[in-house]
Amino acid sequence: MKRIIHFILIALFLIPCCAVQASHQPEFSTAGFFQLPNSGREVFSMNPAWRFYKGAVAGAEAANFNDAEWTVVSLPNGIEYLPTEASGCINYQGEVWYRKHFTPADALKGKKLFLHFEAIMGKSKVFVNGKLLTEHFGGYLPVVVDISDVLNWGEDNVIAVW
């Protein structure tokens, strides 16, 4: 009987602690890019509605490239990373492309604007409107790109990641 009472008392103590922790979870990524009160920084999720193509495609970095037939995915997106027993030790190692169309709000003019990729696996190139902004050669690591000077205001802009 004593054990049951101890268990109930411990449970009653721990339940409010868990509730407090759950209420303080960040609304955005745990990578540090979440909205902070009174910081002046705005955060916009670009994760939904990327165009995806598995394979080599010439000219896919160009803003006017036709990606209408590509698969639509949300990020993060695993290309084809399967467990060894499911893939026969053969995971896809070729080229892939991701493209995102967006029109920036005029209210953002004059501000510093960055793309923050929480992680890109392996070698990659990031283009905005056909212009190569950075190359990444690491493992599954974050990539941050300043896009302030390459946006076309009031028009369709395209991020392309190879």
Give, region by region, the residue ranges found by the protein language model.
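Bacterial N-terminal signal peptides
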Residues: 8-17
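Bacterial N-terminal signal peptides that target proteins for export
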Residues: 1-8
